[in-house]
Amino acid sequence: DAKQFDAHTVLGSILLGHKPTEVHSTMVAHLTKALIGRLIDTDPAAVVGLKGCKNVAEVAARKAELLDTAYECGLYHDVGKSAVILNIDNNGRRLIDEEFQGIQTHPAIGCGLLQEAGCGKYMAPAALYHHRFYNGQGGYPKDVPPCPPEVKVIVDALSVADSLDAATDNIGRCYQMAKPFRTLVGELKAQCGTRYAPKVVALFDDKDFCAELA
């Protein structure tokens, strides 16, 4: 509808204000969609609950809709960086503590922007929780309630997708060096069950799927 179009136009304009964030967000959107699509194809029971899907048959029937939502959640997950990034990561050096604390505000800022844009049901919580650990025991922001179950699997996929692209990307990032894909997969597996969702990490056991992503 017109309201949704206007919201997406505004949000897209925000991303365009910082090209590295736009590129990263687009890549994360594609990766999140790919991960959710793979889960639907190989383990649809893991996706039950997403957007209220009650069983695997409903997951299969609504696959296109679920993939669209996964893509949008990935595309706008970092929209909150618009408030902090221009003053931080163009300096060609590692972040100082105060700057990293500023970066840590972007999930809550993004959640607020998405709620104001009328995208509060799925995209806003995806933005808020994408740096929280799968087990709820780490990450940021702190002191937030558990992630809503109707979007949790997208957040689980988004968290992996965000780490995957961020850690393999040299563009516009002064606070860490890019890593080889295999190295990152090893790190995902090392933090499986704590930071990352086991069912999402298990997708990387498929060499053909890894080849598609790498």
Each PLM stretch: what is its role?
Residues 93-95, 172-181:
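Short, charged, surface-exposed loops that flank catalytic or proteolytic processing sites
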Residues 51-74, 114-159, 174-176, 188-214:
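Histidine/acidic-rich helix-loop-helix segments that form or flank divalent-metal centers
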Residues 155-169:
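Conserved beta-strand-loop-short alpha-helix elements that form
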Residues 27-36, 102-115, 180-196:
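An active-site-proximal "capping" alpha-helix that borders the catalytic cofactor pocket
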Residues 78-92, 131-140, 165, 170:
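Acidic, Mg2+-coordinating active-site segments of isoprenoid diphosphate-utilizing enzymes
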Residues 1-104, 121:
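Acidic/His-rich, divalent-metal-binding segments that scaffold phosphate/diphosphate chemistry
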Residues 11-18, 114, 168-172:
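Short amphipathic alpha-helical interaction patches enriched in hydrophobic/aromatic residues
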Residues 8, 67, 107-108, 161-164, ...:
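Residue-level signal for cytosolic alpha-helical hairpin/rod architecture
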